[in-house]
Amino acid sequence: TISADKAAARAAHLLLSGPAGGLIGANQCFPHSNLMTFDMGGTSTDVALIEGSITPATSAELDGLPLAMPALDLTTIGAGGGSIAWINEGGLLSLGPASAGASPGPACYQQGGSKPTVTDAHAVLGHFEGAETLSDDIQLSSEAAARAIQPLAEALGMPLSDTASGIIDLANEKMAQALRVISIQRGFDPADFALTCFGGAGGLHLCSLAQSLGMRRAV
């Protein structure tokens, strides 16, 4: 943690601190372990590889600008629970990089959002059954999620549930590819690592990602 006064004086030190905090937490929970981590939030997902210990980045940048400060070796992709699904010019289902964000959020939040998101796809498929109440202000609605995804289903000529599954598959493939980049393309076998998730949407995708990468352990 950092005090408000220190944060004001050294604001640059807060850059990418959220993803770094999750990575440090995973390493402390499972010290000296081989881990692949993914932090899936509303707009993006951060992935990293820990081979016994956390690796500092040799260089880092934010929005194309170099950061002249210490950073961890993280890779970020534009896929999160709020990523918006759409039909591209070729008539195919696509996902992101646009996001519904925290406000108005996914359609299923019933806070004014109307665009179909990854979270809405989970709601349509019943993945939140028994856990629909997020707070006093947010009650998840599978009906609202279905209304948002239905136009995509009609455009694709597919059942609603298949369209929802397709949205989730797209999100999974984006994250799986990012995990392959930090492992296979660097000479590591994912099967030698445990997949560890955090972030609001991480648990919804953990097992599917582990299976697609041939990983035997998921936390």
Residue ranges and their predicted role:
Residues T1-V219:
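N-terminally biased helix-coil "hinge/interface" segments that flank
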